[in-house]
Amino acid sequence: MAKLTKRMKAIKAGVDSTKQYEINEAITVLKQFTSTKFVESVDVAVNLGIDARKSDQNVRGATVLPHGTGRSVRVAVFTQGANVDAAKAAGADLVGMEDLAEQIKKGEMNFDVVIASPDAMRVVGQLGQILGPRGLMPNPKVGTVTPNVAEAVKNAKSGQIRYRNDKNGIIHTTIGKANFSAEQLKENLQALLAALTKAKPATAKGIFIRKVSVSTTQGAGVAVDQSSL
């Protein structure tokens, strides 16, 4: 078993794993142990009351965080016609069709999000084995296959996050950076939870959002008292 670093020992000693922290207190605890070497992301894990083995209970979607994620996002767009100029005007970093597909086939993957207009999916569909495993395949459920590519680009650039539960029914995503204010992180978390509540499957019974924990990239999870949200 790997030895705990001094920092991890301090974090574990400073976080009560049996306690649910009020949100502002939870953020204070996170910031107290954040790294001084780089600005860590603030991540969240949300345990949902779903049966992830049932396809009709899986939760997937996207939402724009009011204060963004704190990271720069490069966007590639597959489209043609008038949408080309619209995508570029909205801030897309790469725009194309077959030419863009060829770049990707050569291993040129200098982007974080892929957006496609419906008429471009015949080209994008050929890239499934490349984009799929990386979580980059455009999907209408998260708004990345859309006739309005300009809006999708703006959303991606302004702090849109995508979420999808894992096999244990847990959503893992980012809600900002450790240098965000407590209020910014709280409002981003509230936006995510509101989106998840809206996406609750009709077949899911009982308490839907069962547990919320926040952590920094290299820190321990801090359970949040949902009543403080």
Swiss-Prot record:
GO molecular function annotation = rRNA binding; structural constituent of ribosome; tRNA binding
Q: What Pfam families has UniProt attached to this entry?
A: Ribosomal_L1
Q: Which UniProt keywords apply?
A: Repressor, Ribonucleoprotein, Ribosomal protein, RNA-binding, rRNA-binding, Translation regulation, tRNA-binding
Mind listing the GO biological process terms from this record? Answer: regulation of translation; translation
Gene3D superfamilies linked to this entry: 3.30.190.20, 3.40.50.790
Question: Which cellular component terms (GO) are annotated to the entry?
Answer: cytosolic large ribosomal subunit
Q: Which InterPro entries match?
A: Ribosom_uL1_bac-type (IPR005878), Ribosomal_uL1 (IPR002143), Ribosomal_uL1-like (IPR023674), Ribosomal_uL1/biogenesis (IPR028364), Ribosomal_uL1_3-a/b-sand (IPR016095), Ribosomal_uL1_CS (IPR023673)
Superkingdom of the source? Bacteria
Which HAMAP family does the annotation name? Ribosomal_uL1_B (MF_01318_B)
The family assignment reads: Belongs to the universal ribosomal protein uL1 family.
What job does this protein perform? Binds directly to 23S rRNA. The L1 stalk is quite mobile in the ribosome, and is involved in E site tRNA release.
Oligomeric state and partners?
A: Part of the 50S ribosomal subunit.
What is this protein called in UniProt? Large ribosomal subunit protein uL1
Q: What is the originating organism of this protein?
A: Histophilus somni (strain 129Pt)
**Upper lineage:** Bacteria, Pseudomonadati, Pseudomonadota, Gammaproteobacteria, Pasteurellales
